[in-house]
Swiss-Prot record:
Oligomer and partners: Heterohexadecamer of 8 large and 8 small subunits.
Similarity comment: Belongs to the RuBisCO small chain family.
Originating organism: Acidithiobacillus ferrooxidans (Thiobacillus ferrooxidans)
Keyword check for tRNA-binding: no
Designated name of the protein: Ribulose bisphosphate carboxylase small subunit 1
Amino acid sequence: MADIQDYNSTPKYETFSYLPAMGPEKMRRQIAYLINQGWNPGIEHVEPERASTYYWYMWKLPMFGEQSVDTVIMELEACHRAHPGHHVRLVGYDNYSQSQGSAFVVFRGR
């Protein structure tokens, strides 16, 4: 039991938080996967200090039926430009199961 300790680390907000940061190409592939599953992309943002205790703000409306990875990336970047200090995440809404199929932070706030 002497080996067990509490590790101080950055907060984890979603699946990929435990992996090294994704580069642009890996991000594109994740967005393409989300779209290929038939999930509707949606963008959310929040102040870093409120990320784990409050709902995240919706950026515009979910992009129902969007098939273009580039369009999703442009909206992610637009949200980040409008709210540079916020965390920005992409959510894939699954119509069939009426739940989130995927969610990951794209930009981390300061």
